[in-house]
Amino acid sequence: MSIEEIPQGADVSILSKNEKKARELIKKLNLKQIKGITRVTFKQRGNLIYAIDQPDVFRSSAGTYVVFGEAKVDDMNKRIAEAQQQQAQQDALSKAAGETGEAGEEDKSQDAITADLEKASLNTNKIEEEEADDGEVDESGLDAKDIDIIVEQTQVSRAKAVKALRVHDGDMVNAIMELS
């Protein structure tokens, strides 16, 4: 069959001479062809992806795979940038729609959720610090060097360090473990 005889729009793949030889050798190795695979991707450093659409995949008895097809390079950084741009456009459209009278919908974007979580964690941290730093703490019976070491290691207030030392009867290791 020549190229002129192939009907227009037919799904025909033309194999190179080297690929034909490789396929013949694969048949001699008794590899099993795996049907139903539509895409194979290979990931490399820097979010670089090699993608093969509609591949011919063969599996050996040892569990290795041989993949035939046209490899295309996908740059994940570019895809991520495009996705972020689309997300920004959708956010702008939803804000514009919200201003026209569709109020009541909550913002469920990733940035909004992250901001809400950070705000909540900052509020709880402030409350805890206010409770702990109510005034001077009685350090009698404890070594000042131990308190300084705990404050330095765990980055907590002096009052919390004293409280942890008192709970653990002056044991620095357990106090540090509790605070970190």
From Swiss-Prot:
Query: What is this protein identified as?
Result: Nascent polypeptide-associated complex subunit alpha
User: Where does this protein have compositionally biased stretches of type Low complexity?
Assistant: 82-100
Q: What does this protein do?
A: Component of the nascent polypeptide-associated complex (NAC), a dynamic component of the ribosomal exit tunnel, protecting the emerging polypeptides from interaction with other cytoplasmic proteins to ensure appropriate nascent protein targeting. The NAC complex also promotes mitochondrial protein import by enhancing productive ribosome interactions with the outer mitochondrial membrane and blocks the inappropriate interaction of ribosomes translating non-secretory nascent polypeptides with translocation sites in the membrane of the endoplasmic reticulum.
Which SMART domains has this protein been placed in?
Answer: NAC
Membership in a protein family: Belongs to the NAC-alpha family.
A single GO cellular-component term from the record reads: nucleus
Question: GO: which molecular function terms?
Answer: phosphatidic acid binding; phosphatidylinositol-3,5-bisphosphate binding; phosphatidylinositol-3-phosphate binding; phosphatidylinositol-4-phosphate binding; unfolded protein binding
Pfam families tied to this protein: NAC (PF01849), UBA_HYPK (PF19026)
Keywords, ordered alphabetically: Cytoplasm, Nucleus, Protein transport, Transport
Q: Where do the NAC-A/B domain residues begin and end? A: 16-80
Q: Does the keyword tRNA processing apply?
A: no
Q: Where in the cell is it found?
A: Cytoplasm; Nucleus
Sequence ranges assigned to domain UBA in this UniProt record: 142-179
